[in-house]
Design a protein with these regions (language model features):
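Active-site-adjacent structural elements that line small-molecule/cofactor binding pockets in enzymes
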Residues: 1-206
Length: 206
């Protein structure tokens, strides 16, 4: 997010896709124990990291837009999304990542979808709670773009809210569109709702 990169980190947000590509070009070989000699626009690196017995961890990028998804497919292992609804995952995220991974000859198709989740008998109260808790995300351009693709006014519109069976069905349906992992961001208007939501999510763990 531009406001984070510039205002909090004091870095340039001028070319975020180029910056991420170069970052991964440096980091991925280092994680594999290979030496790196890199002179670029954002980084100048000469060196290596040696961790005896270590193996490279999976690297996932919070890639949402088309160009960042393509960089992710070419160099990393997958993406972690937020404020991205099921239609956008099905029609944008998953196919864009898969096509770019196929083109690069890589299996970088991991999609971790994070969404707000609440098991409740009072849908309207939960929607109001979601609108309050997650309002800031609808104001950040990257998330706003994903909400617009979904036709959602705000994060509450893509929250998974309902009875235990309804929530379970909606979470499981994500696997059918190519989501490989689900990250539940639990919330509730009451302590009981939070507890019921946690119990439901735990019951779905595989």
């Amino acid at each position: 997010h531009q406001i984070v990169v510039e205002s909090m980190w004091g870095m340039s947000f001028d070319k975020p896709v180029r910056h991420m590509r170069e970052y991964l070009e440096v980091m991925m070989p280092l994680l594999e124990g290979k030496p790196v000699s890199h002179a670029g626009e954002a980084f100048n690196v000469n060196g290596g990291v040696n961790v005896p017995g270590g193996t490279r961890p999976n690297v996932v990028i919070a890639a949402l837009g088309e160009q960042m998804l393509k960089v992710t497919a070419a160099l990393a292992d997958g993406t972690l999304t937020w404020c991205t609804g099921p239609q956008t995952l099905a029609n944008h995220t998953v196919p864009t990542l898969k096509a770019a991974a196929d083109k690069a000859g890589r299996d970088a198709t991991r999609v971790i979808a994070a969404l707000p989740v609440c098991v409740t008998n009072d849908r309207e109260a939960a929607l109001q709670r979601a609108a309050q808790v997650f309002v800031v995300y609808g104001q950040l351009p990257s998330y706003r773009a994903m909400l617009d693709k979904e036709g959602a006014a705000g994060p509450a519109d893509i929250a998974i809210i309902g009875s235990a069976s309804e929530v379970a069905d909606r979470i499981m349906a994500l696997a059918e569109i190519g989501v490989t992992d689900f990250a539940a961001v639990e919330f509730g208007a009451t302590p009981d709702e939070v507890a019921e939501t946690r119990a439901l999510v735990k019951s779905l763990l595989k």
